[in-house]
Amino acid sequence: MLVTPLLLVTLLCALCSAVLYDSSSYVYYYQSAFRPPSGWHLQGGAYAVVNISSEFNNAGSSSGCTVGIIHGGRVVNASSIAMTAPSSGMAWSSSQFCTAHCNFSDTTVFVTHCYKHGGCPLTGMLQQNLIRVSAMKNGQLFYNLTVSVAKYPTFRSFQCVNNLTSVYLNGDLVYTSNETIDVTSAGVYFKAGGPITYKVMREVKALAYFVNGTAQDVILCDGSPRGLLACQYNTGNFSDGFYPFTNSSLVKQKFIVYRENSVNTTCTLHNFIFHNETGANPNPSGVQNIQTYQTKTAQSGYYNFNFSFLSSFVYKESNFMYGSYHPSCKFRLETINNGLWFNSLSVSIAYGPLQGGCKQSVFKGRATCCYAYSYGGPSLCKGVYSGELDHNFECGLLVYVTKSGGSRIQTATEPPVITQNNYNNITLNTCVDYNIYGRTGQGFITNVTDSAVSYNYLADAGLAILDTSGSIDIFVVQGEYGLNYYKVNPCEDVNQQFVVSGGKLVGILTSRNETGSQLLENQFYIKITNGTRRFRRSITENVANCPYVSYGKFCIKPDGSIATIVPKQLEQFVAPLFNVTENVLIPNSFNLTVTDEYIQTRMDKVQINCLQYVCGSSLDCRKLFQQYGPVCDNILSVVNSVGQKEDMELLNFYSSTKPAGFNTPVLSNVSTGEFNISLLLTNPSSRRKRSLIEDLLFTSVESVGLPTNDAYKNCTAGPLGFFKDLACAREYNGLLVLPPIITAEMQALYTSSLVASMAFGGITAAGAIPFATQLQARINHLGITQSLLLKNQEKIAASFNKAIGHMQEGFRSTSLALQQIQDVVSKQSAILTETMASLNKNFGAISSVIQEIYQQFDAIQANAQVDRLITGRLSSLSVLASAKQAEYIRVSQQRELATQKINECVKSQSIRYSFCGNGRHVLTIPQNAPNGIVFIHFSYTPDSFVNVTAIVGFCVKPANASQYAIVPANGRGIFIQVNGSYYITARDMYMPRAITAGDVVTLTSCQANYVSVNKTVITTFVDNDDFDFNDELSKWWNDTKHELPDFDKFNYTVPILDIDSEIDRIQGVIQGLNDSLIDLEKLSILKTYIKWPWYVWLAIAFATIIFILILGWVFFMTGCCGCCCGCFGIMPLMSKCGKKSSYYTTFDNDVVTEQYRPKKSV
């Protein structure tokens, strides 16, 4: 099971209990009398804890709390709250617990106790050992439940739930109604016995596991990995494997990317222009009769009031009742445009008396402020006060201003310019709604500056790169230290899968490289520990097999760790690359040819989220898709099974192709009879002229010499060979040479000759000639030897440099060939990656199309249209599954071929012509390549051909017997005719030889048997007139219109592998290596033996005598000389040796007594 059963907690009955689960992290209430059958069911009634707090005392410093009142409440505004006391509980006493309550808006439910006369305002006095649960609305009690303390000895918990306003006391339901209202406030009033723990909760859906009507386990659908997996598949039991999922509860944020860091906006300035009214009449009596002109009212924005005509008028200050009156306006009309703010503003002009006209207009509410100006007008304006209505006063200009304070309206002299500073706060690594340079959408933003900055993308003031659908793919933002590049990915990865190993949810496989992820094959793995993501750990362990879930060569264990699957037979496998040490002999009529061959042995695995591909994020489509049953599971099972079989076969392939060790045969003590196989075995070392005893008794000295040293050595062989030293001298290129080594005998001989030649002057001077001649010959030998060594060194260096050059060129050509293979495979992978990325983009388009269908049609028509889309997309997924199966079959066949190639071409020498390269196989070197293996075959191909006459066989016709036929035996070759004679030769190499009995097979007849195949036997042969193709096609494809959605158009050029030029270069390198032979000048090694001096031989003689004496003494003292008396002939011991020696005889002063003991049987 994926989840851990909570065996300590069981819900007993409907609407009667509520217990906290999972270390009190959530609570589950099943509120129905109907019990679902056993199994997992998606239910409501689960509440997850979002906040925890504690309180130790809220009764202050008093000796106890006051019973019968509600106190200590706190505002929560939550779906549920649980208030719990310590496990020992709290006593129903004012010294500890008084009241607990919950407020559901206008309804309050509480539990309390009160045993005082007149001191219980809420419940009245209760009898001893009774408690009261009550509910009241707007101060009026409407529910009472009296319970004995025998049922609840102490206060333990008080839980309130919004669903049907349920209240639980000590886990038992004590109040409910038919309303669902959130808890607004709650609290416990107590003095001691705490602390009281408050757990505020929110409502979530839950997947509950029922057994006999009782919930045994609960999984919250809260967006956690465990909740996402269980609630999407409606089960908590999962076997090991991979489970695609869709996270529809993504937290969405929003950000905007601006084109510029700041924007200047010029606002509109509204101009109001006032002028003098030339035809205005004097006002009648009373302020209400003053007529207004040119009323201008500002709405919102910026305004300019133009009073330029006032330049010919004289402003009249306020003087009691005369002139202007504007105490509420701290400005003059000349300064009204100086950036003043108003909520409302209206201006008009009028003509009235300067005496009291402004003041009375403000008092009567005609204006907020009034400004008076004199223009020398007539005194024809009537008064405005009650005693002056019939009096005439000087007429003046009155300007009415009606306003209120605020910020909707601002005055200005010029159009204002507003600068807006833009800050690009980009939210990374989460799903967001974005507005990037005016293009809106939803995506997962990642920073790709490190990988994109070196390519100078968008270097010419570009802002973004769009994909084929017109959406933003990559955009750039100017940062503090240069350009920053960001990539927009789909919010939901269609390849994301949960990994279940050992029955536990251990990780996530995704195609998105997130922080802390770990690359496994072509996916990224994120380990999950305790329901949360964790940073990656390196792979440090190898396992021989994986009993859990595996992905490629990686084994995912139940603790989430990763191990590499390495079968035991592969642990010590090391494949050398170009370490070729074999010697190949090539016939003159053949050329060495190098052929490369690439075989694919593995395939890229693809994971598709079926539900996401079909419906996108449309909830209506997903609801309709439930009618299709497990079709997605069937398609995914096909794709996943292909991946699993691919992994298993790949491991078996590597296991089966491991090179086995070869045991060296031991051929000692093997008799081959009359067959001489000495040429096949190692030649024994030839015996030297000196024996082992000579090598032991003489010191040898080796020296490098000329080829003439061998003749000199043979000439001086013998006991007195040193006398022939000068006579055995040889010539080399016209120079007399002797080996440079002189023994002691030669030195004594030549020294005595030189001394004798100097005894009598010129008479004996000729005796020095041998000494001078041998000295000159030895100097010649040394000079020539040094010259030859120098020449050989130059030849070796030149040839070695040439060989190294050819080897480097060969490795470079091989590297280029492999690089081309890498490029081809990489481009194929890039095409697949681009295809999957485009599918990700298309999923967003799918959601948009479905959403438009539901917006444009009613429910029935929309479901019909979406049903067609679902059918089409399921068909596409079926085609994908079939394609992966076909690809798997093809790759599996390629693996079988690769296995044959390794076994037949690499581990052995193939006898099949052109199976391992072109021509007859010599050697094959394997090399790892992307998704496969490259074989480099060395073979020899014909260079020249001989035109011969071939004969199938011979028909023999004896004189006195029936005729018979002979044909070549299998593998022996073919019969040929050369110059009238018949021979047999191999089919692939011209080697004519006489025909022997072992080369033929005898046939009983010279006739050939023919088998005729009738047309009716093989039914696959079809005449042209058997059926009409057009007629047959019209039956099944008649006026049928098939339209496929126009997704991204792919236009890819598939690369073709061509490395012929590199192979030609390798062949040239081989020819160059063949030419790098070294023809060195021949030298020889001369070994000269030098005898030891006389004192060495004297020491050897003394050591031999002492050894013999010690050996005789040992024989005498141990009485074991009986077998040696005749050999040594020691006469004084004969009498002792004549006696019988026994292990049981004791000697004292030679022979004193002789004791015999019984002999023991052995």
Swiss-Prot record:
GO terms for cellular component: host cell endoplasmic reticulum-Golgi intermediate compartment membrane; membrane; viral envelope; virion membrane. The keyword Coiled coil applies. SUPFAM superfamilies: Coronavirus S2 glycoprotein. It comes from the Viruses. Changing residue 723 to L: In strain: Isolate Vero cell-adapted p36 and Isolate Vero cell-adapted p65. The chain crosses the membrane at residues 1096-1116. InterPro entries: CoV_S1_C (IPR043607), S2_sf_CoV (IPR043473), Spike_S2_CoV (IPR002552), Spike_S2_CoV_C (IPR043614), Spike_S2_CoV_HR1 (IPR044873), Spike_S2_CoV_HR2 (IPR044874). Residues 19-1095 are extracellular. The keyword Coiled coil applies. Homotrimer; each monomer consists of a S1 and a S2 subunit. The resulting peplomers protrude from the virus surface as spikes. This is Spike glycoprotein. It comes from Avian infectious bronchitis virus (strain Beaudette).
